[in-house]
């Protein structure tokens, strides 16, 4: 079944409720319609996630269709993406939005946390209300600041912040996706509220090979080059994009397979040094 097309029919603002109901009741009768495909520029296959990326998309699609059929039952989809910085969490959120024909409303901690007492809580409530009114997927990006375990809170506002987020998330009937690099500091009650929790891990060999080909297509990398990069177990898609951007400013005669491999390895060494410096443990 072409879920992408089906969901566009359900959410279309040009269709009446009776037309939408017909699509729900007869989801396989799509042959007479023009079917559109989603943006294919984002390659899900390179991601290393605890749940396969395409399966995540299908889970969301299934929930939307089933929610439309079941009146009065649980509504809303709550998703948590956690793991390494630059591992594709935000990009997958955009892909999901594209897959179901909806837009993202993106929020981050800097835009939510306020200086005045109660301001942050109001901003959280406002974000959920805005997503509801605009019928968008709500993405809270890197929101470690208000996911913190309440038992460790040193200020009362930290507790009320988590409480407000829990309240708003539970009553929200749309899709909310949250991303964090630090799941280990998250409030336990917060974690239990998510329907889908996905860990984003370092790239495997095949992911490294695929991204080398995508970002540096004119170079011929050896299997040893690929193994050198992936053995650190910290390489992410963001590393390749960052290095590709930097190479614009270089004399291209100096850019070789060896240089690219060395630079990517240096990035991983810097990550490892950073973890040791601030006392992180695996």
Where are the regions that the model predicts?
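Walker A/P-loop NTP-binding motif of AAA+ ATPase domains
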Residues: 45-224
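C-terminal alpha-helical "lid" subdomain
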Residues: 2-45, 193, 205-282
């Amino acid at each position: 079944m072409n879920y992408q097309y089906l969901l566009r029919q359900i959410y279309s603002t040009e269709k009446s409720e009776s037309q939408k109901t017909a699509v729900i009741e007869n989801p396989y009768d799509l042959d007479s319609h023009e079917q559109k495909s989603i943006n294919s520029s984002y390659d899900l296959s390179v991601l290393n996630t605890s749940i396969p990326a395409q399966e995540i998309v299908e889970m969301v699609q299934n929930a939307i269709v089933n929610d439309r059929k079941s009146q009065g039952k649980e509504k809303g989809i709550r998703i948590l993406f956690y793991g390494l910085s630059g591992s594709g969490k935000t990009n997958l959120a955009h892909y999901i939005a594209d897959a179901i024909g909806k837009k993202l409303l993106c929020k981050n901690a800097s835009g939510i946390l306020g200086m005045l007492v109660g301001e942050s809580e109001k901003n959280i409530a406002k974000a959920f209300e805005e997503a509801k009114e605009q019928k968008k997927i709500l993405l809270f990006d890197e929101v470690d600041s208000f996911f913190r375990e309440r038992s460790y809170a040193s200020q009362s506002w930290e507790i009320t912040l988590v409480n407000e987020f829990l309240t708003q998330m539970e009553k929200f009937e749309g899709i909310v996706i949250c991303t964090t690099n630090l799941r280990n500091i998250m409030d336990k009650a917060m974690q239990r509220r998510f329907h889908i929790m996905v860990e984003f891990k370092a790239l495997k060999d095949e992911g490294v090979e695929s991204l080398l080909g995508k970002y540096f297509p004119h170079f011929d990398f050896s299997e040893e080059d690929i193994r050198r990069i992936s053995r650190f177990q910290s390489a992410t898609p963001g590393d390749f994009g960052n290095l590709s951007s930097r190479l614009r400013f270089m004399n291209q005669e100096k850019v070789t397979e060896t240089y690219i491999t060395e630079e990517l390895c240096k990035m991983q060494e810097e990550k490892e040094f950073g973890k040791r410096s601030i006392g992180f443990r695996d």
